[in-house]
């Protein structure tokens, strides 16, 4: 499984706008010795708001090195479908605010809305050849419902809490 491991890194709008951002990523790839295809930069919609053309150019430069991109927290911000049409992203990350109520009973006040929205997001993303990651998965029931919706990947406390490096290494070794 380690050969399939992807290192996903959150990137803030401020970091992404820095003039030397591309050089820093290239240097990091060389210094650490990872395959650039194993690096996935997670960008929130706020990164895109200021200057879409400059964002697209930076993404294209990094993509030429093999870096992949995820659109993080989809559905919580400026969510323009025009972004999905233009951005060279690989993964759409559905925000936990959608997934946390996916297994709520229909009489809970939420009704079918969370599931219907997730079904629609997943269907749209798959039509755009994007993988879909559901954030905030905490229970088996949520995971099973998200699987039925077609989610490809999952993140949340059901699998692990965030770990310091040493604990991650021990966890990873135990998975082999």
Where are these regions (language model features)?
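EAL-family c-di-GMP phosphodiesterase catalytic domain
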Residues: 10-19, 38-53, 65-176
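Conserved functional hotspot residues or short segments at active or partner-binding sites
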Residues: 58
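Phosphate-binding/switch loop-helix module in NTP-utilizing enzymes
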Residues: 61
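Helix C-cap/alpha-to-beta connector motif
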Residues: 1-11, 27-38, 65
């Amino acid at each position: 499984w380690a050969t399939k491991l992807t290192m996903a890194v959150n990137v803030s709008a401020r970091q992404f706008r820095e003039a030397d951002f591309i050089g820093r990523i290239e240097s990091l790839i060389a210094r650490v010795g990872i395959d650039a295809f194993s690096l996935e930069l997670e960008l929130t919609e706020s990164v895109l708001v200021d200057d879409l053309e400059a964002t697209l150019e930076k993404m294209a430069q990094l993509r030429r090195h093999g870096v992949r991109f995820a659109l993080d927290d989809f559905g919580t911000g400026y969510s323009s479908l025009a972004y999905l049409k233009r951005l060279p992203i690989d993964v759409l990350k559905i925000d936990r605010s959608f997934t946390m109520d996916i297994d709520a009973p229909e009489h809970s006040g939420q009704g079918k809305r969370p599931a219907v929205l997730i079904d629609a997001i997943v269907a749209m993303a798959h039509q755009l050849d994007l993988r879909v990651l559901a954030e905030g998965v905490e229970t088996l029931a949520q995971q099973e419902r998200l699987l039925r919706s077609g989610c490809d990947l999952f993140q949340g406390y059901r699998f692990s809490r965030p770990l310091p490096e040493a604990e991650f290494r021990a966890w990873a070794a135990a998975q082999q």
